[in-house]
Amino acid sequence: MQKHDTKGFKVGDNIRIVEMVGEPHYNGKVGVIESIDDMGQLHGSWGGLAVHADEDKIERV
């Protein structure tokens, strides 16, 4: 199974979405990473869409 790069982010980290590709209304949202799926997508309290650590711009807060 291929390991996907989560850029060091882990469950429990507080993050801010700086830029989510194709979803500008998520930019600036803050939340906690609640799970990471098998594809390396980050799911959390910022809303219904997953963050892709290798595509979207996020930062720890």
Write out the residue ranges for each language-model feature.
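Basic/aromatic-rich interaction segments and small domains that mediate binding to polyanionic partners
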Residues: 6, 10-61
